[in-house]
Amino acid sequence: MIDKISRTVVGRMRLLLAAVEKERVKRRPLLINETRFSRDRWEDSIICPTDFYFDCFQFFHSGFEKRLRDHRFYFATNGRGFGEDAFHVLWWMLLQVLRPKTFLEIGVYRGQVLSLVSLLQGILQINGTVTGISPFLPSGDSVSKYRSDVDYRDDTIKNFQHFKLPDPDLIKAFSTDKSASDKIRSGKWDMVYIDGNHDYEVAKQDWEICAQNLNRGGIIVLDDSALNTEYRPPAFATGGHPGPSLLAQEVDSSRFNEILRVGHNRVFQLIQ
């Protein structure tokens, strides 16, 4: 009983400290503009990942397009999505520069990233599609637990409808299922976001099959993969989880270049 009370108190203190730091950073003067995030500045995110993360966070709150902020606020409400505010700036950068026509997400949850990519495709006039592979069940892993009172597939579709987006292509399967691997192999992908099971063995399998089915110059964004890097997350962010972080360390640098980091999301591009 005492241990449970102690954990509750510690958890609430962490949330309070995170909220205080978040407000402090939001109130800093904005000293950057959109040029900070142009393609020729992405190397800064590798060299100084913590500073770059703060720039993304501040830009989201002070200079970002309102409809993209509104999208994040919608998913941040009532537990509709995880992630961090700065990640919306990450996807905006990627879509602006790389303009993916075929996008695949492994691990959809309730559709925050999948719908954001669809929204950005519309804003940027990219004639593209979005595909999601997910069990759409409250299935967790060694580091994640999910609500059991949500129909995740139906909820994802409703969230797309809320933003008046085209219906996504949703595959109800674990990424290790044959139907999922068949879908991944069915074409070539411009961009893949791996955010499914965070256990190393599963994340590695996801990486390997996706890496084999990328277009030339294709992208893999690896979630929760910045432990053991120079990135030092603030109290309102995280560095990721051990499984994806170990996987990121093992990426073959003769096949992939790391081109961008925002927080615990790391972006790798297939060398042409």
Predicted feature locations:
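Membrane-proximal basic amphipathic "stem/tether" segments
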Residues: 1-76
